[in-house]
């Protein structure tokens, strides 16, 4: 059976297709290949909205007493949500109409053409995306190239996108998987670019 949603650190997370800008999915890097194998490769908007609604009916986030405690929903899965904008543009307006004030996060490589970064950020804001979690496993181009193996763009573009997103008013966090090389340098770079924090996540064994 293929699924459309799962819980990652207790947050409802949705599959966003299979298009990737790099050699491997972030789920694979997180050691979650088994989960990835169960995800529906071609999610459609109606099915995603139904999966979200079902999670809320089953009690998701009922413990949150204020908006500030809401984790909301995230788009991640076996693809990169920035390469699934058409799907997001079908899901998010309907979701926000039903659940106003619930935050939306995209978990992404952030590999975007520098010339398109600003416009893309405005598009995300128009879709009421509040947060971005961007994979930043290195603080220099060679180490980034080795860690990510991007199919298009690279270190300069991800740095530009982090900066553009923070400037546009999106809440940006960066993350890497343990054991990260030079975490202090990555954290300093992330902060310099405008990210709020660098999270070092433990991959599943």
Identify what each model region corresponds to.
Residues 1-69:
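N-terminal [4Fe-4S]-dependent radical SAM core
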Residues 2-8, 17, 60, 73, ...:
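Auxiliary Fe-S-binding modules of radical SAM enzymes
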Residues 45-52, 90-91, 155-161:
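Well-ordered, non-membrane alpha-helical segments in soluble/globular domains
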Residues 52-60, 115-129:
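Short amphipathic alpha-helices and their capping/turn segments at secondary-structure boundaries
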Residues 85-89, 115-125, 184-186:
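Distinct, well-ordered alpha-helical segments
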Residues 89-99, 125, 162-169, 191:
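Surface-exposed amphipathic alpha-helices with a cationic face
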